[in-house]
Swiss-Prot record:
Belongs to the class IV-like SAM-binding methyltransferase superfamily. RNA methyltransferase TsnR/AvirB family. Its EC number is 2.1.1.208. PANTHER family: RRNA METHYLTRANSFERASE 3 (PTHR43191), RRNA METHYLTRANSFERASE 3, MITOCHONDRIAL (PTHR43191:SF2). InterPro entries: Alpha/beta_knot_MTases, Ribosomal_eL30-like_sf, rRNA_Methyltransferase, SpoU_MeTrfase, SpoU_sub_bind-like_N, tRNA_m1G_MTases_N. This is 23S rRNA (uridine(2479)-2'-O)-methyltransferase. Specifically methylates the 2'-O-ribose position of uridine-2479 in 23S ribosomal RNA. Confers resistance to antibiotic avilamycin, an orthosomycin antibiotic. It comes from Streptomyces viridochromogenes. Homodimer. Keywords: Antibiotic resistance, Methyltransferase, S-adenosyl-L-methionine, Transferase.
Length: 287
């Protein structure tokens, strides 16, 4: 939230030791349960923090280096974002920054949104991605980044999975986490209730799974229709439950000796084909 003109910036607190507050923030880096209980996670970097603010994510606390001259961006951030501000010793910030070569200038403590499928907008041109039981938070972040870049409307992370708000996922998304709704859902049933409700409301979403023995090649499928693309676990692929629920399955033609693509790369390739079809107006033949 930006301050109104003339409103004074609250005096910042200082933390120079590994006190209880610091330990709470440190736990957000590596403890999923504590992130979930606290309902918050850490964000660092100019673009991710700027996008979090731009898209209205509540920033609970801004931690900044109290012993260096801050950049113009950091000064403006501290001036305009109305929240708790704490000056930190640089060695403490470095620990929160996962001990990179240099401490981050600013770390934001950001509130998690509710895991509500209604956060994902559904229109007649709907294009969404479901990632089934991913084990790599980096892959989650990479798919969020690709889905955002290619105009998808949201990501569903299904089943027992890595955490959307793991630091590796947040970092891999390069800020796209804050512009693309990403929702964690425990079971296929909850997703299908949402899909069926959208179908009943007039948006005939089709579920398209990925499989090396798909019904057709990705280039021959009609992605101009409302589509939820299902990407399987990095090792096991789609679960039997999701395979059964698919309306169609598609495969990516492979050359050379590679047998498959990384899950994030596969999602990106298929999303690109979907967008290409939609831009060109091409309608392929759905089996």
């Amino acid at each position: 939230m930006a301050r109104s003109r003339g409103e004074r910036t609250p005096a910042a607190r200082r933390i120079t030791s590994r006190n209880a507050r610091f330990q709470q923030w440190q736990a957000l880096l590596g403890n999923r349960n504590k992130r979930t209980r606290a309902g918050e996670f850490l964000v660092m970097g100019v673009r991710p923090i700027s996008l979090a603010v731009e898209h209205g994510w509540p920033v609970r606390t801004l931690l900044y280096d109290g012993q260096r001259e801050l950049s113009k961006w950091a000064r403006e951030l501290l001036r305009t974002v109305r929240t708790e501000q704490i000056a930190m010793a640089p060695d403490l910030l470095m620990e929160l920054g996962e001990k990179n070569e240099a401490p981050p200038e600013v770390v934001a403590v950001v509130e998690m949104p509710a895991d509500d499928l209604d956060r994902i907008p559904v229109r007649e041109d709907f294009l969404g991605v479901l990632f089934d039981r991913p084990t790599s938070p980096g892959n989650i972040g990479s798919i969020i980044r690709s889905a955002d870049a290619l105009g998808a409307h949201g990501l569903i992370v299904a089943g027992h999975a890595a955490d959307v708000y793991d630091p590796k996922s947040v970092r891999s998304s390069t800020g796209s986490l804050f512009s693309l709704p990403a929702v964690r859902v425990p079971s296929p049933g909850e997703v299908m209730d949402w899909v069926e409700a959208r179908r009943a409301a007039g948006t005939p979403i089709v579920l398209v799974g990925t499989d090396e023995h798909g019904d057709c090649d990705v280039f021959d499928f009609d992605f101009t229709q409302p589509t939820l693309l299902l990407i399987g676990n990095e090792t096991a692929g789609l679960s039997n439950a999701w395979r059964t629920l698919c309306d169609y399955t598609v495969s990516i033609p492979m050359a050379g000796s590679a047998s498959s693509l990384n899950a994030a790369n596969a999602a990106t390739a298929i999303l690109y084909e979907a967008v290409r079809q939609r831009i060109s107006g091409r309608t392929a033949t759905t089996p």
